């Protein structure tokens, strides 16, 4: 299929205040409620020694899929086709690559500034969870981080929140979207803080850990800004989904290199053995 780099495909608007509110509610349910409902339903049929991490990812993937299905049923065939056309628009793909580049190097720059001012930030609880899961279930992490999360998060924050708000006040739309997007990446951090805050033995450590996690907030805000800018540039949700997917793919690749390849290059007795190990890890992802 030929890509038309000059094609400009904008999302078809959803008319009416109530309809836009309903789209937002569906999005919030899809992000926070549906995966938990699926997890409870699955848990009723699993043995006590089930793999918690594996089934947690399955529940999240199924919950996200349920959200997308419900949203698409609500917005209708014409809008779905319009969104799908955006994924084969050369203009959108080109824009996504450019903005993913800006997101990656912008995050690096902000991270360097934060490190110089406050010391090197540790990865937050959300990132720690991804890192540990990648060791045991790399395929599921890739599926969630590179495909499902970009689709769901962009539909919620750029399509359901930024798009209608920008018609009223674009600056406010940027602020709310950025804060909301960055905030969801601290749900794990806040959960840990709240669980340990009442215990005098752990409260001090919990607060220190949470404050350390907050050092990563500027990085998420930069990512949120670039993703919102990507959507705003073309007015098509496919652009920000692709940008998000490309950016997350680069992060997963770096995680793979840091966890596996660099360790193998250090521990292996030859370059051939290093690449043999690399191919073995690639098999785990397929």
Language-model region placement:
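Generic alpha-helical secondary structure signal
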Residues: 91, 124-128, 214
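Generic signal for short, ordered secondary-structure residues
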Residues: 76, 89, 93, 134-135, ...
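Membrane-interface segments at the starts/ends of alpha-helical transmembrane spans
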Residues: 46-59, 131-135, 203-215
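Transmembrane helix-loop-helix hairpins at the membrane interface
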Residues: 108, 136-286
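Hydrophobic alpha-helical transmembrane segments and immediately flanking/interface helices
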Residues: 121-135, 139
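N-terminal, membrane-interfacial amphipathic/helix-forming hydrophobic leader that caps
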Residues: 1-121, 190-195, 217, 246-286
């Amino acid at each position: 299929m030929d890509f038309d780099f000059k094609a400009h495909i904008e999302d078809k608007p959803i008319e009416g205040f109530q309809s836009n509110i309903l789209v937002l509610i569906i999005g919030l349910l899809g992000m926070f409620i549906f995966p938990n409902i699926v997890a409870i339903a699955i848990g009723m049929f699993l043995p006590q020694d089930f793999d918690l991490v594996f089934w947690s990812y399955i529940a999240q993937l199924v919950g996200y899929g349920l959200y997308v299905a419900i949203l698409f049923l609500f917005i209708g065939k014409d809008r779905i086709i319009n969104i799908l056309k955006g994924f084969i628009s050369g203009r959108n793909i080109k824009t996504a690559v450019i903005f993913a580049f800006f997101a990656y190097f912008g995050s690096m720059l902000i991270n360097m500034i934060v490190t110089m001012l406050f010391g090197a930030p540790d990865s937050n609880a959300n990132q720690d969870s991804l890192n540990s899961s990648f060791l045991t279930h790399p395929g599921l992490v890739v599926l969630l981080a590179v495909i499902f999360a970009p689709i769901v998060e962009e539909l919620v924050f750029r399509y359901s929140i930024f798009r209608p708000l920008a018609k009223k006040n674009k600056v406010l739309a940027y602020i709310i979207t950025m804060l909301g997007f960055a905030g969801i990446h601290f749900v794990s951090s806040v959960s840990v803080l709240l669980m340990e805050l009442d215990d005098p033995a752990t409260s001090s450590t919990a607060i220190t850990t949470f404050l350390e996690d907050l050092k990563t907030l500027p990085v998420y805000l930069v990512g949120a800004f670039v993703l919102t800018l990507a959507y705003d540039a073309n007015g098509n949700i496919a652009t920000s989904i692709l940008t998000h997917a490309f950016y997350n793919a680069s992060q997963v690749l770096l995680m793979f290199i840091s966890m596996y390849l660099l360790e193998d290059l250090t521990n292996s007795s030859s370059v051939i053995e290093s690449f043999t190990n690399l191919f073995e890890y690639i098999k785990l992802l397929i």
